Swiss-Prot record:
Residues 82-85 are annotated as: Involved in Mg(2+) ion dislocation from EF-Tu. Keywords: Cytoplasm, Elongation factor, Protein biosynthesis. It is found in: Cytoplasm. The gene is tsf. It comes from Chloroherpeton thalassium (strain ATCC 35110 / GB-78). This is Elongation factor Ts. SUPFAM superfamilies: Elongation factor Ts (EF-Ts), dimerisation domain, UBA-like. Transmembrane segments: none annotated. InterPro entries: EF-Ts_dimer_sf, Transl_elong_EFTs/EF1B, Transl_elong_EFTs/EF1B_dimer, Transl_elong_Ts_CS, UBA-like_sf.
Length: 289
């Protein structure tokens, strides 16, 4: 067996991020061949990932990024098994690296993201291979549960991350420049995090969902003993309240509850002398489907 120097162990650790003892073992198993040792550690990570595939990964972080021109943004949920690992530097840096790859490529789904290269910092591994290697390094199942992308030509895309990185949002407002809607976009991104709307405007609420809610409210009113002739009016009122809860534009504005989000958007449009709108948003909360 080849003599394994401390420098070789350190070099392998610098290259892979794996612990010193594991690096020494890999070099011993491969007679000191650095490239074979790297491959040994990759296979070890893949084996560990397969072994832990049935484990639940419910902890993690939401990583969100926008391009320098604020025209595009990505949001990614990266999961692990424990909060201890989720708060560790290795995991958080890894999640950030994945979000940077997503921002550079705008993958249309999780599968497309997993197939992308992580670049030279990860020896050209794909995201999927890098996840396997990181699983081997930290000893926990790691997975990407979802990824979202917003791209635009004339809108501002703004991100908000709640402290702890368990909740984050992206919102697109336009047509506008960053200077025109910077304050509004930040406020709306925070609004989405705090108030958890489901859609931008009421036209986007699925009809089947409305019918379901209406039936629930009808049955509630009847159980409460309301006269049947008043039930329809009661249901209509409760549906309006439902809109105020789940429709972003109809929610009370978190910084001034005397206004709705729609009011604030209209005020900004008037100030800019052009019509702007909230075009779409994404809200990721750890563990939510």
């Amino acid at each position: 067996m080849a003599e394994i120097s401390a420098k070789a162990v350190k070099d392998l650790r610098d290259k892979t991020g794996v612990g010193m003892m594991e690096c020494k073992k890999a070099l011993q198993e491969t007679d000191g061949d650095m490239e074979k040792a790297v491959e040994f550690l990759r296979k070890r990570g893949a084996a560990m990932a397969a072994k832990r595939a049935d484990r639940e990964a419910k902890e993690g972080v939401i990583a969100v990024k926008t391009t320098e021109d604020s025209r595009n943004g990505v949001i990614v949920e990266v999961n692990c098994e424990t909060d201890f690992v989720a708060r560790g530097e290795d995991f958080t840096k890894f999640a950030e690296a994945i979000s940077e790859i997503a921002l550079a490529n705008f993958p249309e789904n999780k599968e497309a993201l997993l197939a992308l290269s992580m670049g030279d910092d990860y020896q050209g591994q794909t995201v999927e291979q890098a996840i396997e290697a990181m699983t081997g390094k930290i000893g926990e199942k790691i997975e990407i549960s979802k990824v979202g992308v917003i791209t635009s030509n004339d809108s501002v895309v703004t991100a908000y991350v709640h402290p702890g990185a368990k909740l984050a949002t992206l919102v697109e407002i336009g047509p506008a420049s960053t200077d025109e809607v910077e304050d509004l976009s930040k406020d709306v991104a925070m609004q989405i995090a705090a108030a958890a709307p489901l859609v931008v405007d009421r036209s986007a609420v699925p009809q089947e969902k409305l019918a379901q809610e209406a039936e629930i409210y009808k049955q509630q009113a009847l159980r409460e003993g309301k006269p049947e002739k008043f039930v329809e009016k009661i249901v209509t009122g409760r549906i309006e309240k439902y809109y105020q809860d789940v429709v972003l534009l109809e929610q009370a504005f978190i910084k001034d509850s005397s206004k709705t989000v729609s009011d604030v958007v209209k005020e900004t449009s008037k100030r800019l002398n052009k019509t702007i709108e909230i075009r779409c948003f994404l809200r990721y909360q750890l563990g939510e489907k």
